[in-house]
Amino acid sequence: METPDYNTPQGGTPSAGSQRTVVEDDSSLIKAVQKGDVVRVQQLLEKGADANACEDTWGWTPLHNAVQAGRVDIVNLLLSHGADPHRRKKNGATPFIIAGIQGDVKLLEILLSCGADVNECDENGFTAFMEAAERGNAEALRFLFAKGANVNLRRQTTKDKRRLKQGGATALMSAAEKGHLEVLRILLNDMKAEVDARDNMGRNALIRTLLNWDCENVEEITSILIQHGADVNVRGERGKTPLIAAVERKHTGLVQMLLSREGINIDARDNEGKTALLIAVDKQLKEIVQLLLEKGADKCDDLVWIARRNHDYHLVKLLLPYVANPDTDPPAGDWSPHSSRWGTALKSLHSMTRPMIGKLKIFIHDDYKIAGTSEGAVYLGIYDNREVAVKVFRENSPRGCKEVSCLRDCGDHSNLVAFYGREDDKGCLYVCVSLCEWTLEEFLRLPREEPVENGEDKFAHSILLSIFEGVQKLHLHGYSHQDLQPQNILIDSKKAVRLADFDQSIRWMGESQMVRRDLEDLGRLVLYVVMKGEIPFETLKTQNDEVLLTMSPDEETKDLIHCLFSPGENVKNCLVDLLGHPFFWTWENRYRTLRNVGNESDIKVRKCKSDLLRLLQHQTLEPPRSFDQWTSKIDKNVMDEMNHFYEKRKKNPYQDTVGDLLKFIRNIGEHINEEKKRGMKEILGDPSRYFQETFPDLVIYIYKKLKETEYRKHFPQPPPRLSVPEAVGPGGIQS
């Protein structure tokens, strides 16, 4: 709808003189608003000045100016004369966003009533909520949250800026960087803001805070973010970690705080190859050096030489007890690799004289080759005195760039290969990552004890749980692997499962198809692992989804694969949900879930019209189940004894309903260990195994019926950070 022209006389076009008057009145209106002269504003509006006039440079309208000045009276006056509350400045800011900057709740309320969108943003992605957080306006923040503001919205900026990895910050990041403690606590405690959200550079609120030297209250803010679970190994500009940033700040308290966190990577290197300890020595920070040494920081750099170069005798004296030989490299005999498979070759490489490529010693020879790749190969290497696998790419290789970008952005994670550094030399890129012992394909071929114990395949569950966790981590950082296969899943010397080979990975911006590819590959990997690699993965890739589902050995595996093949709309969070799938439950947990549901009062008293029994009822069009006539499948002596309890009390015996079956399982669990039930226990054996084998589709049936209801409270909940259970096999699988 066009804005009416209040300055055009009836009956024809305006004269040149009247046009000059209009322009002058428009300019005067803006100046009157800026001065807060409400009388003059009213006079000009009544005279016909344009309420939507804007100055040429930045596009400020009278309404923008009135909101900035906090003049409710002038705002109302302008709105009554046709001022457009949706008009944007040249940077896309609306009057509503300006009100967020000012933290004026009254003006926010007025503009919302005029149709403003609570989540509208300018060209840099700033919303009123983000502006309130950035400026510490707690009252405005609470008001906007109550009106539906998106707490975790990321700044959506222009395509050109996204290419430069700009934008993507959240309100929490702004509040943390600016040192607004009250707003930070409100966002985390009351509004449940995502503490580890990442911007387009992969930075979270913690690293943005530590790298901003102007941030106030930095120690308290860091403590709050860490307590709420912020990733302490995240990387920021130039590959800096929070620990490195704290050392560069020369802030001993921050260093102590970070070193106290479990999982801190004390030896992480920035893009220049510097560790926190090296920086502390170079900056002559004796107290921080002491802290890092006591925490076991790696002493592989020329630390004593650096201290001597700086003529810091006290620091030299501090370092000497921690450095085995400050003047020479350790002899080959004193260097022992962790790898058993590659140990002999690594010792040979360590002892030979080779020209160093930066911090890397490598010999491009078949004796030290791990595997071939599409562009080159993977070789053994020693990087900074650490055994590594080195992927060799052509210089400026798109695949190599993808590999480095993904590894850096995703940071350290126990289910991804660790990234130690890169070197460039003579047209080649050398990417150094953690060295592993086997591919998944090789590992499944190793001789081991029978992995399936009493029908429960803990071995497969352990491996797949690690793989799922690694892929989930990848997706949370905005990457899709695109090449999940047994050759790209590795097992290290500690039997930990690690995802590798990210040279085909894609940075996705919400395109679900990228993630669907990973989920489909995961579905095939589930079947591959469960079947112990008996069917080659390439063969599984040629089979359609329906054929693969029919190959599943049990209902839990079948449903898990189906969920991966058909994730629905919630593609991004699919793996988060599936980590709680019955496939990953132990048999004891499955049995406990059935007992707990059976312990619901509606089931115990057979309340036929209850919501729970209605949910559990078998629908007419559903396929037949193993438990449809369940009373006939229970051992007759056990069934008779359990029914006898009700017959004595002249109550109905157990019926062929799901509710009664759950009630039966509950009662068995409550009484089977009683002395008088010894005979029953001898017949049933382990109840968890008995019911799983007798009714193999019962657990998945209950799960699918109740997973979207309040009764999911009976399901075992995965811990915040899933750890992989001990597996049978050569040494077990670790997380």
Curated annotation (Swiss-Prot):
Induction: By interferons. Virus replication in higher vertebrates is restrained by IFNs that cause cells to transcribe genes encoding antiviral proteins, such as 2'-5' oligoadenylate synthetases (OASs). oligoadenylate synthetase is stimulated by dsRNA to produce 5'-phosphorylated, 2'-5'-linked oligoadenylates (2-5A), whose function is to activate RNASEL. Signal peptide: none annotated. Residues 26-51 are annotated as: Binding to TMEV Leader protein. Disulfide bonds: none annotated. PROSITE patterns: ANK_REP_REGION (PS50297), ANK_REPEAT (PS50088), KEN (PS51392), PROTEIN_KINASE_DOM (PS50011). InterPro entries: Ankyrin_rpt, Ankyrin_rpt-contain_sf, KEN_dom, KEN_sf, Kinase-like_dom_sf, Prot_kinase_dom, RNase-L_RNase. Residues 1-21, 714-735 are annotated as: Disordered. Residues 364-584 form the Protein kinase domain. Residues 253-275 are annotated as: 2-5A binding (P-loop) 2. A zinc finger (C6-type) spans 401-436. Keywords: ANK repeat, Antiviral defense, ATP-binding, Cytoplasm, Endonuclease, Hydrolase, Metal-binding, Mitochondrion, Nuclease, Nucleotide-binding, Repeat, RNA-binding, Zinc, Zinc-finger. Pfam families: Ank, Ank_2, Ank_4, Pkinase, Ribonuc_2-5A. After binding to 2-5A (5'-phosphorylated 2',5'-linked oligoadenylates) the homodimerization and subsequent activation occurs. Inhibited by RNASEL inhibitor ABCE1/RLI, a cytoplasmic member of the ATP-binding cassette (ABC) transporter family. Expressed in spleen, thymus, lung, testis, kidney, liver and heart. Its cofactor is Mn(2+); Mg(2+). ANK repeats lie at residues 24-53, 58-87, 91-120, 124-153, 167-197, 201-234, 238-268, 272-301, 303-328. Its EC number is 3.1.26.-. It is found in: Cytoplasm; Mitochondrion. Belongs to the protein kinase superfamily. The nine ankyrin repeats also called 2-5A sensor constitute the N-terminus 2-5A binding domain. Endoribonuclease that functions in the interferon (IFN) antiviral response. In INF treated and virus infected cells, RNASEL probably mediates its antiviral effects through a combination of direct cleavage of single-stranded viral RNAs, inhibition of protein synthesis through the degradation of rRNA, induction of apoptosis, and induction of other antiviral genes. RNASEL mediated apoptosis is the result of a JNK-dependent stress-response pathway leading to cytochrome c release from mitochondria and caspase-dependent apoptosis. (Microbial infection) Interacts (via N-terminus) with TMEV leader protein; this interaction prevents RNASEL activation by its substrate 2'-5' oligoadenylates. PANTHER family: 2-5A-DEPENDENT RIBONUCLEASE. This is 2-5A-dependent ribonuclease. It comes from Mus musculus (Mouse). The gene is Rnasel.
